[in-house]
Amino acid sequence: MTAPAELSPTLQLACDLIRRPSVTPVDADCQAQMMKRLGAVGFQLEPMRIEDVDNFWATHGNQDGPVLCFAGHTDVVPTGPVQQWQHEPFEALIDADGMLCGRGAADMKGSLASMVVASERFVQDYPNHRGRVAFLITSDEEGPAHHGTKAVVERLIARNERLDWCIVGEPSSTTLLGDVVKNGRRGSLGAKLTVRGKQGHVAYPHLARNPIHLAAPALAELAAEHWDEGNAFFPPTSFQISNLNSGTGATNVVPGDLIAVFNFRFSTESTVEGLQARVSAILDKHELDWSIDWALSGLPFLTEPGELLDAVSASIKGVTGRDTQPSTSGGTSDGRFIATMGTQVVELGPVNATIHQVDERILASDLDLLTEIYYQTLVRLLA
């Protein structure tokens, strides 16, 4: 284990944040530590407590010129069985292999530390930089995400805040730091479908209507449907059934209804309204007695090659020597809320191989490299 005195400023802050057990939506004073550091170098701080969620918005600079925002979350997912961890989940130690171990190391307290240290250095090196450096931080990303970034963005829009570029510190890298950045995400549309039949005795099927038998052909057709072709930036839209429930538990009772939960991860080639209409048409074709509750988690967004992606790519190349690969794969992130401001959004963070797992860990030295990548991006865009 590396002694604290030997740690870089980024690693010292990362360890401090990891040692705070901020399981969503608890912040455990992580944001207070970040704001203390940012305030010391001249950032204007605006805490935003919304319901049970801590958020903050911070800016440095002037209203003239573009805004580059660092966005992220201080909350982490639960540890799972603590006894399965090699080390205490919130101990934040660097092992003999040089790995920083602890819940949140990759997702995403390491990124938060790199953002803070890079910004401290930038505003000290360029006190009269153009535009503004901003932070949008929440403790509600791993949970429902109702009172976090989404709510803060709504407030920013209401007061006409400008947000040109945003780097979200999600762990985007796959094998090596910076090998992949996320320049967009698919939309997520969920549904809970109820198909109604008529309960009865299995020995008297003519007196019942089995919703399992009735729904099966429609569900099979939905699963086989080709929703779109995707495009140069997005794979084709996917449909997956995640839950299927029916029956009373008794073996001699035809159930009265069936509930199916499914999800679309959709590209920019499809719309919410279009997907909903096609689902309705298939269900009606099979003459089902049905109802459905839809839940939109986020629309797809895409940052095409331009100032932000170019600056991030050049910084990764300059620091690591490798070319990055833009990607829109994976799940949703808070970038979907920020993109509604017309903002160019890129996700760039550590290797994601162990996120949400027991023994979450990243290469400790990657965080100093990530700090330099963030710093170089600031220089390219705002110096």
Curated annotation (Swiss-Prot):
Pathway: Amino-acid biosynthesis; L-lysine biosynthesis via DAP pathway; LL-2,6-diaminopimelate from (S)-tetrahydrodipicolinate (succinylase route): step 3/3. The gene is dapE. One of its GO terms (molecular function) is succinyl-diaminopimelate desuccinylase activity. Zn(2+) 1 binds at residues 73, 107, 170. It catalyses: N-succinyl-(2S,6S)-2,6-diaminopimelate + H2O = (2S,6S)-2,6-diaminopimelate + succinate. SUPFAM superfamilies: Bacterial exopeptidase dimerisation domain, Zn-dependent exopeptidases. Keywords: Amino-acid biosynthesis, Cobalt, Diaminopimelate biosynthesis, Hydrolase, Lysine biosynthesis, Metal-binding, Zinc. This is Succinyl-diaminopimelate desuccinylase. Belongs to the peptidase M20A family. DapE subfamily. GO terms for biological process: diaminopimelate biosynthetic process; L-arginine biosynthetic process; lysine biosynthetic process via diaminopimelate. Its EC number is 3.5.1.18.
